[in-house]
Amino acid sequence: MPTISQLVRKPRKAKRTKSKVPALESCPQKRGVCTRVYTTTPKKPNSALRKVARVRLTNGYEVSSYIGGEGHNLQEHSVVLIRGGRVKDLPGVRYHTVRGSLDTAGVKDRKQARSKYGSKRPKSA
C-alpha cells in the first residue's frame, strides 16, 4: 500500500473502460451500406431464424447488425442507419439497424412500441 507522499508524487491511474460499440466512434448512430443480408440461428437454448445484415460503415468498419421487427425490405446495397445495442443470443452482433430511417422501412401494422420500429400512428376507426 503506498504512502500519502507516494500518492502525491504519482497519483492512481483511473481504469479506462473499453467501448461496447467501438465502430460507432462515440457517435449515437452511423450510416452504412449493406454488403450481405442473411438469417442466422441463435445460441442454445433459443431457436429461430434471426435477420442480420453485414454493414460497411462510412468510417470503414464492417459490422453485423440485427434487423428487429417482423419483415424487412433490406437487400444488398441498401443504405441503413446503425445504433448500438447487442443481441444476447447472437454472438458477434453488437449493433441494431434503425427502422424507419434511410432505406429501412418501418414495421407494418405495428400498434405498440411504434417509435422503436419506425411505424406511423394508425388512423382511428
Curated annotation (Swiss-Prot):
Q: Name one GO molecular function term.
A: tRNA binding
Going by the entry's taxonomy, the superkingdom of the source organism is recorded as: Bacteria
SUPFAM superfamilies in the cross-refs: Nucleic acid-binding proteins
> What are the 3-methylthioaspartic acid sites (modified residues) in this protein?
89
Q: Which PROSITE patterns match?
A: RIBOSOMAL_S12
Q: Which GO terms describe its cellular component?
A: small ribosomal subunit
Write down the CDD domains for this protein, in alphabetical order.
Answer: Ribosomal_S12
Specify where the region named Disordered lies, as residue ranges. 1-24, 101-125
List UniProt keywords, sorted A-Z: Methylation, Ribonucleoprotein, Ribosomal protein, RNA-binding, rRNA-binding, tRNA-binding
Q: Where is the composition biased (Basic residues)?
A: 9-19, 113-125
Q: Kindly indicate whether the keyword Ribosomal protein belongs to this entry.
A: yes
Keyword tRNA-binding set for record: yes
Q: Name the protein family.
A: Belongs to the universal ribosomal protein uS12 family.
> Subunit comment for this entry?
Part of the 30S ribosomal subunit. Contacts proteins S8 and S17. May interact with IF1 in the 30S initiation complex.
What does the record give as the function of this protein?
With S4 and S5 plays an important role in translational accuracy.
Instruction: Report the protein name in the record.
Output: Small ribosomal subunit protein uS12
Q: Which organism is it from?
A: Nitrosomonas europaea (strain ATCC 19718 / CIP 103999 / KCTC 2705 / NBRC 14298)
Lineage of source species:
Bacteria, Pseudomonadati, Pseudomonadota, Betaproteobacteria, Nitrosomonadales
